[in-house]
Amino acid sequence: MTKSHSEEVIVPEFNSSAKELPRPLAEKCPSIIKKFISAYDAKPDFVARSPGRVNLIGEHIDYCDFSVLPLAIDFDMLCAVKVLNEKNPSITLINADPKFAQRKFDLPLDGSYVTIDPSVSDWSNYFKCGLHVAHSFLKKLAPERFASAPLAGLQVFCEGDVPTGSGLSSSAAFICAVALAVVKANMGPGYHMSKQNLMRITVVAEHYVGVNNGGMDQAASVCGEEDHALYVEFKPQLKATPFKFPQLKNHEISFVIANTLVVSNKFETAPTNYNLRVVEVTTAANVLAATYGVVLLSGKEGSSTNKGNLRDFMNVYYARYHNISTPWNGDIESGIERLTKMLVLVEESLANKKQGFSVDDVAQSLNCSREEFTRDYLTTSPVRFQVLKLYQRAKHVYSESLRVLKAVKLMTTASFTADEDFFKQFGALMNESQASCDKLYECSCPEIDKICSIALSNGSYGSRLTGAGWGGCTVHLVPGGPNGNIEKVKEALANEFYKVKYPKITDAELENAIIVSKPALGSCLYEL
């Protein structure tokens, strides 16, 4: 296994004397530096950059603490920064996109945090999220400097090409770039930020604008590497391990990312979609535990998962029946063995109610009253349902988690006599994932299904939804390079989906809706 991004792995830093710059810096730094000079009539000191991400495989399993396989993409957020030496420091923000107005705010002289008002929807709030977590980190890192004194004033020019609202984590990319920039600006050239620290501090950043997330977005943005996918683990701690894609003879490994342009309003649909799935997988874990006579350890307090989850069940089952007291540590081979066993148990104990469990059925399985089940499982977040589909949801979580491990194993141990062998085998896992998301987890939609069908008919080997589903983005494994299928897939999607469903779509909107990426470098710095 390649080395995970632990404390000693530093965020890459480059400067103008570097012989060769990474692809995104070489392409984008000259332009943002010119724009900064035009805006501020001065040169920036450095540029901080962090990319968006796409999840290749591992959907709706992170909140059960199972590992996922995202990669950083060629679309990113950049912040060009000049550090100011002011008695009354302030931060000025200019965005290359004119729809995001210029902002300026003072930094508290006593070293207190800049306030964030989550009730106001403004792009500067996301900057302030990155500022806040960086400030908190600096206070712990050098309390003598930052406990009761202000941060350095900054002039910042922001530019990004991660399509917003597309499920490619533009907000995480922006916040990671901001946090990196603020730490660099205040600690100076002698301090080098570790990837682990940047990932750790940014995971909680969006909580300040009322968004809860599990850490995959930040891990992928910070730790991405060219030609690698990231095996992101959530237990026992957040960790990202890069795995290199195989070197193919005649093709590049590329991904077409196509946005359905269907927006699922998370707040409105949560009672029948996201919130309900969390309740169903939590209930499934507890019904399995009751069936096999084991007790789940309490999970995260303050959420429906304080009842434990499907990974917790796997661990306590193996402790009881296989005398393995150590919880699964993310190892690929033992994970494959355990998840395969979990799928057997799901068939044994939940398949008799494929049509769904009523509240009375669940209460009987848990040996509690209707009222107790309702109180303990159904009151944390609003949900609406006729029956709880415990069999389908548990089967998806365990089979999807197994596919993640099989994908990593395929990348690291398999040998391919022809390029097509890799595309077929990896693509098959992606197609199985989509089928599971559609049939078992029911988080697809007609537009996702249509896009996947068109792509597979025109040269994609694996096509699936990515992100929460019910709309949003799709990802497609497509051979790249001179002999590849990229243009054929893009053209088919444009003609058979976008121009049919959205006849008034503009060229610019179409360009934003279908993007192509290879696995890209994560967060980095460029010093002038």
Curated annotation (Swiss-Prot):
Keywords: ATP-binding, Carbohydrate metabolism, Galactose metabolism, Kinase, Nucleotide-binding, Phosphoprotein, Transferase. One of its GO terms (biological process) is carbohydrate phosphorylation. The active site is at D217. It holds the Pfam family GHMP_kinases_C. GO terms for cellular component: cytoplasm; cytosol; nucleus; transcription regulator complex. ATP binds at G165, G167, S169, S170, S264, N265, K266. Optimum pH is 8.0-9.0. One of its GO terms (molecular function) is galactokinase activity. It catalyses: alpha-D-galactose + ATP = alpha-D-galactose 1-phosphate + ADP + H(+). Its EC number is 2.7.1.6. The keyword RNA-binding does not apply. Induction: Expression is regulated by the GAL4 transcription factor. The keyword Ribosomal protein does not apply. PROSITE patterns: GALACTOKINASE, GHMP_KINASES_ATP. Pathway: Carbohydrate metabolism; galactose metabolism. Belongs to the GHMP kinase family. GalK subfamily. Galactokinase is a key enzyme in the galactose metabolism where it catalyzes the conversion of alpha-D-galactose to galactose 1-phosphate. Can also induce the transcription of the yeast GAL genes in response to the organism being challenged with galactose as the sole source of carbon. It's striking amino acid sequence similarity to GAL3 might explain its GAL3-like induction activity. This is Galactokinase. It comes from Saccharomyces cerevisiae (strain ATCC 204508 / S288c). The gene is GAL1.
